Amino acid sequence: MLFRSPVDLREVTIALSAEAVIGAGAAPASEAASRLADLLDSGAALDRFRLLTERQGGDPAVVDDPALLPRAPFISEFPAAGSGFVSRIDAREVGFAAVELGAGRRRAGDAVDPAVGFEVLVRVGERVSERQSLVRIHARSEEAAGRALDRLESAVALSDSPPAPAGPLVWKRVAGR
């Protein structure tokens, strides 16, 4: 079974990867994105990910069975305080909350806990109801989840009306090629 990603994640991943391919001289700009899409669609990219996982000492079976990944012992939900539209999700603040859980580093030598983190369950522009879960928090303890929840409360905003449509995912190429 091939991994299926949200369309927007696929789009930005291909755009960023195409820049690397072009920069390395592996393909001209006119072909890079379509070659990468073919690698994703054929499963070749997933095969390469399995190989890289194994060569870095990981278990390549997790690619096909994510249940083998470490699990956080405490899972909680961040519910909407009211009804409305998700008008903002501050990625920077979500990132700080993730570091607070141990999913990121404060300093280069810090360990990263692969079992903790967030599942963001809604998108900007989505209509939500009061108490609907917006984010699922995977933490080592109830206290850690509470600290993350405090940060998430300032990261997610709701409004009574839908936000303006977002612009394109890729605004422009800086590489200049």
What is each model feature region?
Residues M1-R177:
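Well-ordered secondary-structure scaffolds
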